[in-house]
A protein has these predicted regions:
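Mid-to-C-terminal secondary-structure elements
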Residues: 12-192
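Membrane-interface junction motifs in transport/secretion proteins
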Residues: 1-7, 29
Length: 192
């Protein structure tokens, strides 16, 4: 559910559903979502020869709870947290290697996207969140109020017991109809 509302009562009711095993606050959107920002990185620390085509990077919101929800492993550095700034970034290992670094070497390095210089504070293990036949996308994770559009697009992420999706979907649709105003948007994405 997306929209301007107090999510607390809805989250409480979702947690009460017998098929639900975990619920997160509405701070993120699904990693398989099409609601991703794309950054274009064209310079980084140690780049000797300018590149002709910027490296596209899918950007997501992500603090430690997000990574734990998706069971994404931190290979080097630290998680983003409430003290992190918009200039701090966690990248995946494929992006670190594309830039010529091991995960450990990437920590503290700087990458540049037009007018923003990011400091790499963490590197996470690659994970497939697209088709397994496609290469793993270069991915970055950020926090901060400057990510306003991404924050406003956030929804409630949850996990449910295997084999209960149809029952879960029906229960969520019923909650949406009884607990949400028509201005709110219901999007149900199922990840396997």
């Amino acid at each position: 559910v997306m929209g301007d509302m107090d999510y607390t009562p809805l989250i409480r009711k979702i947690k009460e559903l017998p098929m639900i095993t975990e619920v997160m606050q509405p701070d993120y959107y699904p990693i398989v979502s099409q609601l991703t920002a794309i950054g274009q990185f064209d310079n980084w620390e140690g780049l000797d020869i300018p590149i002709d085509t910027p490296v596209p990077v899918k950007l997501f919101l992500g603090k430690e709870d997000f990574f734990r929800f998706y069971d994404i492993t931190l290979l080097a550095g630290e998680w983003l947290d409430d003290l992190s700034t918009y200039e701090d970034i966690i990248i995946n290992e494929s992006l670190a290697r594309r830039m010529g670094w091991s995960p450990q070497e990437a920590i503290g390095k700087h990458i540049i996207q037009s007018y923003i210089t990011y400091t790499i504070v963490g590197v996470v293990k690659d994970c497939h969140y697209g088709a397994p036949t496609l290469p793993i996308p270069h991915t970055g994770f950020l926090v901060g109020e400057q990510m306003g559009l991404m924050q406003r697009s956030a929804g409630i992420l949850f996990k449910y017991k295997e084999g209960t999706w149809n029952e879960c979907r029906k229960a969520l649709e019923h909650l949406y109809q009884t607990e949400c105003s028509p201005e709110n948007i219901l999007r149900l994405n199922s990840e396997h």
